[in-house]
Amino acid sequence: MIETDKLAAERIIAATPTSSHEEVFERALRPRQLDDYVGQEKVRGQLEIFIEAAKRRSEPLDHVLLFGPPGLGKTTLAHIIAREMGVNLRQTSGPVLERAGDLAALLTNLEANDVLFIDEIHRLSPVVEEILYPALEDYQIDIMIGEGPAARSVKLDLQPFTLVGATTRAGMLTNPLRDRFGIVARLEFYDADQLARIVRRSASLLNAHIDPSGALEIAKRSRGTPRIANRLLRRVRDFAEVKADGQITAAVADAALAMLDVDPVGFDLMDRKLLEAILHKFDGGPVGIDNLAAAIGEERDTIEDVLEPYLIQQGFLQRTPRGRVATLLTYRHFGLSAPDAGNAERGMWDTPAGK
C-alpha cells in the first residue's frame, strides 16, 4: 500500500492531496459559506434546512456523515457547517486517534454545539469507536481510572456537539457507528460546467486571468473533481505566465495540459499505458489482473486501487469473470476500430486470460 499511495501522490490527476503545501493552497481557496459552495445541490439544500432549523432551536446539528470519492469537498463542507452554525471546529482523522484517551481529550475540550470533524472515520480503531458511541447518543463517555483491582469506571458529561465524519469507504463503517448519524450525505462527481465555475472562482482568488473557454478546458480534464481542477489551474497559470502573457485561453490551457500529458478526457500516461496494454498486448481483453500488472510493470494493488476506479466509472474498462476488457469507448478514444460483436463475445469468454 505504501507504493500505491506514493504513485497516487505523484500523479497530477490524483484525487488525494499530493503534499502538505497543496493542503495549504486548498485552504486558501476553500469557500466559507454554503452560498459560495458550487455543486452538490441536493446535499447543499438539505444542509441549509437542517442548519437553519438547529439554529432556530439553539440545538447542535445532528451528527453528519459525508461520504464519496476523494477531492469532492467533504472537508470543505465540514468547515462550512461549523461556520454556518457559528461554532468552533476541531479537526482530526481516524488513524490519529489510536487510544481511547486521545478521543476523550478532544471530546472533553469541546464547547457547547461545537463541531468535531473526523476524516477517514472508517479507520477508527474498535477501542476508540466504543468510546464514541455513548458520546454520540448521550453526550457522555466512560473512562477507566487506575489499574488492576483498583481500576474503576468514571462517567464524564460532555457538552452537546456535532460529529461530522468523512469517508471514502462508507462500506467499511460498522453498522452501529453508521446508525448514529442523523444526516447521511453522498457527494457525487461534478460536471464540467460546475467545475468551470470553481476554476473561475479560484482563478479570481489567485489573480489569474482566465477566459470562460480556458476554465472549461481545464474543467473537462479534471475527472469530475474540484481538487484536481484547482491543481491543474495552478500548473496552467504557470504556463500562461511564461508562454502566454498570463492570459489563460482554451488554446493556452490545451497546450499546458498537453505538456503535462493530461489528455482531453483527463487521462495521464498511466491510464493510457494500462488501456493500450489491454488493446495491443491482449487484443482488447479479457486479461487477468496478474498478467496485466506484469505487462505494464505495476503492482496489482496499484492497478486496482489507483488506476482502475476512474476508468471503470467512466466506462472505459470492464471487469468480467474472465478478466479486464476494453470497452467501445476505449477503442474510440484511441481512434481504433472496435472488433465486431461476435468476435468480441468469443474473445471475452473463449480466450485464455491468465490468472
UniProtKB/Swiss-Prot annotation:
Residues engaged in binding DNA: 300, 319, 324
Keyword list (alphabetical) reads: ATP-binding, Cytoplasm, DNA damage, DNA recombination, DNA repair, DNA-binding, Hydrolase, Nucleotide-binding
Q: Which GO terms describe its molecular function?
A: ATP binding; ATP hydrolysis activity; four-way junction DNA binding; four-way junction helicase activity
The record's principal subcellular location, in a coarse class, is cytoplasm
Binding of Mg(2+), residues: 75
Signal sequence region: none
Q: Which GO terms describe its biological process?
A: DNA recombination; DNA repair
Q: Where is this region: Small ATPAse domain (RuvB-S)?
A: 191-261
Question: Where is ATP bound in this sequence?
Answer: 29-30, 71, 74-76, 137-139, 180, 190, 227
Record-level GO cellular component terms: cytoplasm; Holliday junction resolvase complex
Please write the reaction equations for the catalytic activity of this protein. Answer: ATP + H2O = ADP + phosphate + H(+)
Q: Which InterPro entries match?
A: AAA+_ATPase, AAA_lid_4, DNA_helicase_Holl-junc_RuvB, P-loop_NTPase, RuvB-like_N, RuvB_C, WH-like_DNA-bd_sf, WH_DNA-bd_sf
Q: Does the keyword ATP-binding apply?
A: yes
Q: What is known of its domains?
A: Has 3 domains, the large (RuvB-L) and small ATPase (RuvB-S) domains and the C-terminal head (RuvB-H) domain. The head domain binds DNA, while the ATPase domains jointly bind ATP, ADP or are empty depending on the state of the subunit in the translocation cycle. During a single DNA translocation step the structure of each domain remains the same, but their relative positions change.
Q: Which protein family is named in the record? A: Belongs to the RuvB family.
Description of how the protein assembles with itself and partners: Homohexamer. Forms an RuvA(8)-RuvB(12)-Holliday junction (HJ) complex. HJ DNA is sandwiched between 2 RuvA tetramers; dsDNA enters through RuvA and exits via RuvB. An RuvB hexamer assembles on each DNA strand where it exits the tetramer. Each RuvB hexamer is contacted by two RuvA subunits (via domain III) on 2 adjacent RuvB subunits; this complex drives branch migration. In the full resolvosome a probable DNA-RuvA(4)-RuvB(12)-RuvC(2) complex forms which resolves the HJ.
What's the protein name?
Holliday junction branch migration complex subunit RuvB
> From which source organism is this entry?
Burkholderia ambifaria (strain ATCC BAA-244 / DSM 16087 / CCUG 44356 / LMG 19182 / AMMD) (Burkholderia cepacia (strain AMMD))
